[in-house]
Amino acid sequence: MHLMYTLGPDGKRIYTLKKVTESGEITKSAHPARFSPDDKYSRQRVTLKKRFGLVPGQ
């Protein structure tokens, strides 16, 4: 079982172990993606995050 989440009405995460909520909404994984040193697109991803202000700490 993996920790999953869905967004509540106030925009905060509601954590669960279920894949689908009672209302039929599909949950998302609460775990980050695995890191790979062979990631070919990390430069583009970082550039886009900086451009749109999505990098934490800025």
UniProtKB/Swiss-Prot annotation:
Alphabetized SUPFAM superfamilies for the sequence: Nop10-like SnoRNP
Keyword Methyltransferase: no
Residues annotated with Phosphoserine modification: S36
Chief place where the protein resides: nucleus
CC terms in the record's Gene Ontology section: box H/ACA snoRNP complex; nucleolus; sno(s)RNA-containing ribonucleoprotein complex
Entry superkingdom: Eukaryota
Keyword field: Isopeptide bond, Nucleus, Phosphoprotein, Ribonucleoprotein, Ribosome biogenesis, rRNA processing, Ubl conjugation
Crosslink position(s): Glycyl lysine isopeptide (Lys-Gly) (interchain with G-Cter in ubiquitin): K28
InterPro entries reported in the protein's UniProt record: H/ACA_rnp_Nop10 (IPR007264), H/ACA_rnp_Nop10_sf (IPR036756)
Compartments, as annotated in UniProt: Nucleus, Nucleolus
Gene Ontology molecular function terms on file: RNA binding; snoRNA binding; telomerase RNA binding
GO biological process, one term: snRNA pseudouridine synthesis
Subunit note: Component of the small nucleolar ribonucleoprotein particles containing H/ACA-type snoRNAs (H/ACA snoRNPs). The protein component of the H/ACA snoRNP contains CBF5, GAR1, NHP2 and NOP10. The complex contains a stable core composed of CBF5 and NOP10, to which GAR1 and NHP2 subsequently bind.
Family classification: Belongs to the NOP10 family.
Job description of the protein: Non-catalytic component of the H/ACA small nucleolar ribonucleoprotein (H/ACA snoRNP), which catalyzes pseudouridylation of rRNA and is required for ribosome biogenesis. This involves the isomerization of uridine such that the ribose is subsequently attached to C5, instead of the normal N1. Pseudouridine ('psi') residues may serve to stabilize the conformation of rRNAs. The H/ACA snoRNP complex also mediates pseudouridylation of other types of RNAs. The H/ACA snoRNP complex mediates pseudouridylation at position 93 in U2 snRNA. Essential for growth.
Protein name: H/ACA ribonucleoprotein complex subunit NOP10
Species in which this protein is naturally found: Saccharomyces cerevisiae (strain ATCC 204508 / S288c)
